[in-house]
Amino acid sequence: DICLMMRSLYSAVSGLKTNQTAMDVIGNNVANVNTIGFKSSRVVFQDVYSQTLSAATAPTETSGGINPQQVGLGVTISAIGLNMTEGSMQPSSNTLDFAITGEGFFVIRGSDGAYYYTRNGAFTLDADGYLVTANGDYVMGVMGNADDVKNGMPLYDVDGNPIFDRIKIIGSIPTGETDIDGNPIYETYTDYAVDSNGAVTAINSIGEVLTIGRLVLATFNNTGGLEKAGNSYYSVTSNSGEAEIHFVNDGCGAIKSGYLE
């Protein structure tokens, strides 16, 4: 019967196609085994609807019940899910390498002006002293001195917009004060450090160690709903929920300098 043959061929082809997709996902997982901050994916299969050849019948006084007769019509993929569990930490020799112990993501501003989120904490400094990714994208935080920057301070303005900015670690940095003409006063800092709370400290021109800013982390209601955007970045989707911005160690995890996930 041609129809029966087509049905069997369709089921076989659907199995080949879905298993090829599964192999593609597994191959990508293996290829990225040494990619910093990479999160693996898994494929979940489900059967396609079945063709009912005969329906079930109830038992009667003269005969027993009969189960339905159904022929499956193949397989399809129900989900390709992200595994967002925390990865192992590997020590590095770079003090600007950071690993997150917890569920947070670093907040990155791309060259297109959009915000992205990553677990890849392999950072460096650019010529202006800003903390950047290997791609030159800015790592975001809140700039300010020890009195200005503290846990619990609002990270959003009255309209709900984030107030974080690029993190500048060395060089000439605004102090937050102004001179008599209203111009911002700058201070030159050197010898930076970043602690487990994301606090950035540096030494000013007279040798004082001051807190000049804080890194921030983002969390999401549904991390599985994030969309991979390349460069180990993730972007927000309608099913991830909006990013909730926190100071490091404020319910979203701490960071370890000199380690990578």
Q: Which residue ranges define each predicted feature?
A:
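Amphipathic alpha-helical polymerization modules
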Residues: 2-163, 174-261
